[in-house]
Amino acid sequence: CNLGGIIKNIFVRDCRWKLVDVVLGFDTLEQYIAPEYRKNYPYFGALIGRYGNRIKGGEITIDNETHVLNKNEKGNTLHGGTPGFDQRLWDAEQPDNEHLILHYTSPDGENGFPGTLDVTVRYSIENNVFRVIYEASCDQPTLVNLTQHPYFNLRPTDENIGNHELRLYTSHYLETTSDLIPTGTILSTDQKHAFDFNKPLFLALQEDGLDDCYTFGDPIEPQLMAELSHPKNGITVTILSDYPGLQVYMGKYINVANGKGGKHYGPYSGIALEI
């Protein structure tokens, strides 16, 4: 979809060779732009920019110059402000059935960010691998942190993701304030065992869910970050990336009345693995 680069469906085969759509979303374009969806907006499947996650106070300073950004969550800037890249119409080119190229030019000052930013995002599918490549250039110093926001439910007949197992290949995560603003301190999961996913854990064990950024150093090449699986149907999603962090959000605040096939999506209906 060239609206927000939305990933509407991802079909994979389960252990019985049945095709399963493993991401949350809607059946029609109209549902993605409906006002009631935007009121409690979970960013289903969308490209996020200019800056994924939160910026404290909606202000950034670059070269001693302060830029005031669009503030859209408790006085902070979430996912680049409103409207972000998730609500923009992208130019789309489809060379073949396995590749899609999206391009968007964000003008200088859009949502308060400095510089004209040219962004190209490439989607490709090959040998059961779905690949996302981000490219961006700007005519002046700026901040950019692009990400994707699909919510996975590997067994859509389940009302929630409690029976999914998650493994994360790191022992570190970012400390945050009560408003989920990073403090700049990297903590070890040894200090808070509820955050330790070095071994696969059922998500049902996370009583209050997760909305946290796990850190992976500064990789030069894509490295293994996460594995999400459902034991009953044999589907596993493996995440590799050269990003330094992976935001894990268990969808605590999802409340959508009319998802795919008219299904109600409530809290913990899907898990977002944002890279």
How should each PLM-predicted stretch be described?
Residues 1-275:
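An exposed, glycine/acidic-rich loop-and-rim segment of catalytic or binding clefts
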